[in-house]
Amino acid sequence: RIVFGQVGIDLIAGPSEILVVADRHNDPAWIAADLLSQAEHDPSSQSVLIADDRDFAAAVSKAVDAALKTLSRAEIAGASWRDNGCIILVKDLLADSVSIVDRIAAEHVEIAMDTAPAEALAAKISHAGAIFIGRHTPEAIGDYVAGTNHVLPTSRAARFSGGLSVADFLKRTSIVACTPEALAQLGPAALALAEAEGLDAHGRSVSIRLNRRS
């Protein structure tokens, strides 16, 4: 943030976010651990659970409270969960989750379901920094060992950007060259657009080469 605008940077990321879509067949303690894995970063981090079973959701909430007592960063994680954590209940995970996931556009999305429905749900999601599929794929695997970059868009930026990649460190320069024949083909379209924008000099730079008067 200090040098942003003076030089190119990767992206402005943070606070951390996780959204977990989980059915009732999960161990509540596992899901609680996933939610807290991002809550422990910062009091401003956000952890969201989408579930389709009220009893399971309540069990996860209790598991979060129990797990907090064991964390070295309990104060930070607790403040994050208290102020920014939430549980969203839906009737049908496959039918109702996608619109919520895309609206939140979280940094990390876990789909803790059997592989087939998890993959089906993931295929419908348009906005997420990274998606972790299946009950045995906690977000921390992406942080440390999976090989995917964990510098990801936050604050709903996943709606229009992706994670850090080699492309972010490349500088590209466009090169354009027109022959007289190519200009004769492309020029009229450029003239029409320049006229529509009311930019006379733009149009003249083309028409003067086409031996036309603007």
How should these model regions be labeled?
Residues 21-23, 49-52, 88-91, 133-134, ...:
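Short beta-strand-to-turn element immediately C-terminal to the catalytic PLP-Schiff-base lysine
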Residues 1-48:
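Conserved NAD(P)+-binding/catalytic subdomain of aldehyde/semialdehyde dehydrogenases
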Residues 11, 24, 28, 53, ...:
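Generic structural signal for well-ordered, non-membrane alpha-helical segments
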Residues 3-7, 31-36, 94-96, 116-119, ...:
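Glycine-rich, charged/polar anion/phosphate-binding loops
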Residues 99, 103-214:
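C-terminal core of ALDH-fold dehydrogenases
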